[in-house]
């Protein structure tokens, strides 16, 4: 359980970093990370609350569908709650594999993106243990069904299909 002091420190640091970045026209995206990797900012709601508290216009939300699958009860609601504060999304499947073959509710996510008129970055984030060192770096203990090229091509095709269906 985090303390009030930790929350205050987080806000002080974010405010200082945001002010420094703003001088160069940089927007910072804060990514909620699942509870197994962090105890601070594990959901979109928490990050948005801290962003509101810091009140820096160049702080934004950076979602990741892998972490959303663990921490969020919906793929739609966090997108709607973020609105224009959402600027960047890591697109990855629940098992870090091929988009569309896992548990991520892609239609809900893309419906939300359409409703907020999202114009930020959709970034493919696949991991294959065919890449040396990747298995240990991201805890991919089972063999990948696809090599890195197959994952990239198939997932990009899926993203394009979903984007076209939700315009």
Segment roles from a protein language model:
Residues 41-63, 68-167:
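Histidine-acidic metal/acid-base catalytic patches
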Residues 18, 22, 114:
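Anion (oxyanion) recognition and catalysis
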């Amino acid at each position: 359980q985090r303390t009030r002091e930790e929350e205050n420190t987080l806000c002080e640091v974010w405010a200082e970093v945001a002010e420094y970045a703003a001088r160069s026209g940089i927007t910072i995206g804060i990514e909620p990370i699942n509870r197994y990797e962090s105890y601070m900012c594990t959901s979109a709601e928490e990050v948005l609350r801290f962003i509101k508290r810091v009140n820096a216009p160049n702080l934004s939300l950076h979602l990741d569908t892998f972490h959303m699958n663990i921490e969020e009860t919906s793929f739609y609601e966090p997108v709607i709650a973020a609105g224009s504060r959402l600027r960047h999304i890591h697109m990855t499947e629940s098992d870090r594999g091929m988009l569309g073959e896992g548990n991520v509710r892609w239609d809900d996510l893309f419906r939300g993106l359409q409703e907020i008129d999202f114009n930020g970055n959709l970034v493919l984030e696949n991991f294959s243990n065919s890449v040396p060192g990747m298995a240990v770096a991201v805890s991919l203990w089972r063999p990948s069904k696809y090599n890195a090229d197959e994952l990239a091509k198939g997932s990009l095709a899926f993203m394009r299909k979903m984007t076209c269906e939700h315009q």
